[in-house]
């Protein structure tokens, strides 16, 4: 990710909130395999744990999710873990880092017509795209042995907390659906067909590319342009452009 200073977000808490608000991440791995592609990606909803460190500061956090065992990416992960364990390394953590990318709720093309100051003055404007994103790098831990109590405990906790997060934070239900509402035998069967993944975040980076690099007149034009679209996405982006512009001006 290109982290131009004017767009980069350095506050871990803000990036973590972006992840919590938009938990569907894209997991990307690069695993050498005779059977599967080197680079693979999958959309996975995550739970983010972010405990405080020993000095009271906020940790980068840990991402927890699950994947279908039939997913080729999951098969490559299992293959890599098996090869590692056959060499005497009993850890469930793979040595190579992975990447998870999270996108903000809205992104949009920005037409040069929005630049109401520079376009009529010089014409030196080009289109761009506004968006927000966070990327997390870290080592991945694989829970794939359905005969292991550790794996089944991890999966049970993960699916329960992911369901609760989605039912309450996304759906806003006061009486959310719970995993316990489904037959135990059915849940146990499904658990045997998924793997758990846990990623300890070593580096958390992100950006809000929201026209901060433009002057006040052009930013005002961008805000008006998005508001005049009359869409939820337009209204949301207009608000973020305004907010991020004010933050830049205060620095």
Curated annotation (Swiss-Prot):
Signal peptide: none annotated. Pfam families: FMN_bind_2. Transmembrane segments: none annotated. SUPFAM superfamilies: FMN-binding split barrel. Disulfide bonds: none annotated. It comes from the Eukaryota. Belongs to the PaiB family. This is Uncharacterized protein AN0679.
